[in-house]
A protein has these predicted regions:
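Polar, enzyme-active/binding microenvironments
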Residues: 1-168
Length: 168
């Protein structure tokens, strides 16, 4: 799968893509434009990178699709965002939360993004796993850093068992 987050103080913006084969890392095709703190959805050969910030720019709504070697610009998010979570696939993804702290969620259908049910707890810098119809999000900065975990059933979010320790 593909994933990425950088919630530390900016040390530079990167356009690098790396592939992991279970044993070692290799470099893939660079993204068009250096960014940080966006979110990813999908697999190594069919992935999305959405949101983030770039040098001297505010949050972006840009979405880029990866085919295993190169990136292509596709339909933008409705709300520019950063420090959010991404789940799902290249044709059925979620972009979850935003910074500054927000509960907003959008679903992607392979062409365009649509706003769907908001999280119960607004936050940023959270983790997320799953599909567009069955996802979990956990932790994050509400503030303060939270233990909250929520499950998505394709329609709405439900609070479920919390993390033992607050994390972001």
């Amino acid at each position: 799968s593909i994933s990425g987050v950088n919630d530390s103080p900016p040390v530079g913006y990167v356009a690098d893509t790396f592939h992991y084969n279970g044993t070692s890392w290799s470099e893939g095709g660079d993204t068009p434009g250096a960014r940080q703190s966006g979110a990813a959805s999908g697999l190594l050969t069919a992935a999305l990178w959405h949101g983030g910030t770039g040098p001297g720019s505010p949050n972006t709504a840009a979405t880029k699709q990866y085919n295993g070697s190169s990136w292509t610009e596709v339909g933008n998010l409705n709300t520019a965002r950063t420090s959010h979570a991404g789940t799902g696939t290249v044709t059925a993804a979620l972009a979850i939360a935003n910074s500054p702290v927000a509960a907003i969620v959008e679903a992607y259908d392979g062409t365009s993004w649509t706003e769907v049910g908001d999280l119960n707890t607004a936050r940023d810098s959270l983790g997320g796993v799953g599909t567009q119809t069955s996802s979990l999000v956990f932790g994050g900065n509400a503030p303060p850093v939270t233990v909250n975990t929520e499950a998505w059933d394709g329609t709405s979010w439900t609070e479920v068992n919390n993390l033992a320790t607050a994390r972001r």
